[in-house]
């Protein structure tokens, strides 16, 4: 009898241990599933654009390395009415090229005033393409003029950028003498649009800029270098955002998602976004640069534009810098456009 009681007590203790283990497992699963469910819910709030891939045009060209990279077009629009789809010009055009194996990232700013051929519109500034035909025409224009294979995009306006930076606690930026008054002026404009207030920056040097201040910094163009240095500022801010995100705690990252994801417009679906987001801690921005590399700023048909000298040689350099390609030759389309642009100025 005593032996039976001892056995029952042992069984009860064993069941109790299993119950605790199950409770612990349930808690662990909840801790995993709740954040995952939150992420999926937030991603579902993104304004997804189901792009007609048949409308995306590419040239026939040979580049043995380009297939090892995921290339995404990043468009920044200065839309006061939160218009992200089209009918607005792109102030920022960046190709983010991600090495699928190493997760190294290269950022190429395509200067917005670059003189290119846009289908059905002729030669004009690159930033007009998005306004004329939305993402499809903008991406096709990029692909056709620069021998690229971009098929996806992310569009964001300046209000969303400001919110992202604030969610990360600001970004560290060094303010130079010729930038100071313009950063303050543009920051005031951003604050007015956002319905917020902003502190005036009074000293030169390193500052942790708020979202509004950093967005103002991204918009400055009236300094030495004009749009070239503005594009560089935009890449600097992106680098700082990635740096901050990589070191952020989970709560900050959830806050970032809460602020950012509902305010973007993209062709990427949920699985694409989750796949890209899973690599955030491994992404390493190895290089950033502006395109074209060798350029002139002539006036053509009354408009000041940026022309490559020559387009074909600059596109060759672009492929080398983005994809480390050594055996690429420009397509016949790029060669033709290169000769036509050269004859116009």
Residue ranges of each PLM-predicted region?
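Solvent-exposed, acidic/flexible segments
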Residues: 65-71, 77, 84-89, 119, ...
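Amphipathic, coiled-coil-like alpha-helical scaffolding segments used for oligomerization/assembly
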Residues: 132-196, 267-269
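Second-shell loop/turn segments in exported
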Residues: 81-84, 124-132, 147-152, 204, ...
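Extracytoplasmic
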Residues: 67-70, 88-93, 102-110, 121, ...
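Entry/capping segment at the start of metal-dependent catalytic domains
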Residues: 2-103, 275, 301
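C-terminal solvent-exposed extensions
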Residues: 60-62, 87, 118, 122, ...
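Flexible, polar/acidic helix-loop-strand segments at domain edges
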Residues: 166-252
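Extracytoplasmic/secreted envelope proteins and their assembly/folding machinery
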Residues: 92, 123, 135-143, 158-162, ...
């Amino acid at each position: 009898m005593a032996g039976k009681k001892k056995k029952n007590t042992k069984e009860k203790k064993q069941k109790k241990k299993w119950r605790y283990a199950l409770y612990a497992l349930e808690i662990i699963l909840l801790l995993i599933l709740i954040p995952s469910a939150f992420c999926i819910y937030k991603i579902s709030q993104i304004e997804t654009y189901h792009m007609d891939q048949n409308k995306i045009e590419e040239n026939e060209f040979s580049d043995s390395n380009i297939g090892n990279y995921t290339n995404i077009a990043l468009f920044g629009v200065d839309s006061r009415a939160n218009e992200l789809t089209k009918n607005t010009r792109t102030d920022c055009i960046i190709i983010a090229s991600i090495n699928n194996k190493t997760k190294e990232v290269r950022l190429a700013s395509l200067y917005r005033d670059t003189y290119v051929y846009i289908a059905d519109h002729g030669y004009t500034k690159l930033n007009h393409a998005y306004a004329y035909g939305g993402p499809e025409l903008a991406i096709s224009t990029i692909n056709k003029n620069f021998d690229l294979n971009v098929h996806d995009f992310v569009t964001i306006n300046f209000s969303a950028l400001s919110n992202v930076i604030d969610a990360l606690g600001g970004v560290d930026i060094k303010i130079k003498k010729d930038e100071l008054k313009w950063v303050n002026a543009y920051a005031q404009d951003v604050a007015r649009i956002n319905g917020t207030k902003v502190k005036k920056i009074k000293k030169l040097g390193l500052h942790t800029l708020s979202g509004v201040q950093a967005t103002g910094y991204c918009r400055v163009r009236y300094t030495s270098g004009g749009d070239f240095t503005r594009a560089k500022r935009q890449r600097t801010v992106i680098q700082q955002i990635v740096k901050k995100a990589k070191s952020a705690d989970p709560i900050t990252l959830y806050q970032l998602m809460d602020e950012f994801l509902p305010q973007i417009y993209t062709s990427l679906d949920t699985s694409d976004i989750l796949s890209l987001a899973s690599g955030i801690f491994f992404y390493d921005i190895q290089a950033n640069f502006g395109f074209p590399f060798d350029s002139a700023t002539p006036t053509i048909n009354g408009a000041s534009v940026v022309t490559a000298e020559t387009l074909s040689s600059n596109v060759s350099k672009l492929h080398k810098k983005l994809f480390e390609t050594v055996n690429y030759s420009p397509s016949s389309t790029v060669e033709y456009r290169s000769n036509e642009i050269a004859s116009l100025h």
